[in-house]
From Swiss-Prot:
Organism ancestry: Viruses, Riboviria, Orthornavirae, Kitrinoviricota, Alsuviricetes
Protein name according to UniProt: Coat protein
One Pfam family this sequence matches: Flexi_CP
Biased composition (Basic and acidic residues): 12-23
Role description: Required for genome encapsidation. Forms ribonucleoprotein complexes along with TGB1 helicase and viral RNA.
Length: 215
């Protein structure tokens, strides 16, 4: 191989595997890319501590936070853990540069278990056409229940059935489709408000026009 700082001129040595002991020494920390990294989690904890949430109470607050989570990152959080408002924890995620969804994903299992024990299914299932028998499949971070690298639950709960997983997949695809339709409609409305459609010349004044609804 080339010496340090010298240009490589021959690739032969780089087509060989390392020695067995060297290869075995190469390890990674098991983690999920949907959950916060250790560094991200520490940033959130420290940001929350500056607002009055002690590190000792962080896990409990994060579970309540996840139980309070709705459909999107723009959810309006109304709950509290003791006196600490969940809205403040959402803002601390923002301060730390970590999406709210990541924190909720990480604490899904205990939050899900607590909701199951209290028989409080996610409110979304009633207005999202989710079959009653699969109402728990509408849980916002349902995928985390199948992720071995997130925080486990001390309270037992029923594992998702294959049917629940299938319903959740359909549910997610339907929500993505609806979101795309809403974004398209909002974009069209914004263009109309400005007096023109994308790619079209500005409309002249004092005229009456029929604008066909988006397909």
């Amino acid at each position: 191989m080339a010496t340090q700082n010298a240009d490589v001129t021959d690739a032969t040595d780089y087509k060989k595997p390392p020695a067995e002991t060297e290869q075995k020494a190469l390890t990674i920390q098991p983690r999920s890319n949907k959950a916060p990294s250790d560094e991200e989690l520490v940033r959130i904890i420290n940001a929350a501590q500056k607002r009055g949430l002690t590190p000792a109470a962080f896990v409990q607050a994060a579970i309540v936070f996840t139980m309070d989570k709705g459909a999107t990152d723009s959810t309006i959080f109304t709950g509290k853990y003791n006196t600490f408002p969940m809205k403040s924890l959402a803002l601390r995620c923002k301060d730390a540069g970590v999406p709210v969804h990541k924190l909720c994903y990480f604490y899904t299992k205990p939050a899900y278990a607590n909701r199951r024990v209290a028989n409080q299914p996610p409110a979304r299932w009633t207005n999202e056409n989710v079959p009653k028998a699969n109402k728990w499949a509408a849980f916002d971070t349902f995928d985390a229940l199948l992720d071995p690298y997130v925080v486990p639950s001390s309270v037992p709960y029923d594992e998702p059935t294959p049917e629940d997983r299938q319903v959740n997949e359909i549910f997610k695809k339907d929500n993505l489709s609806q979101a795309a339709s809403r974004n398209q409609l909002l974009g069209t409305q914004a263009s109309i408000t400005r007096g023109r459609l994308n790619g079209a010349p500005a409309l002249p004044n004092n005229g009456q026009y029929f604008i066909e609804a988006p397909q």
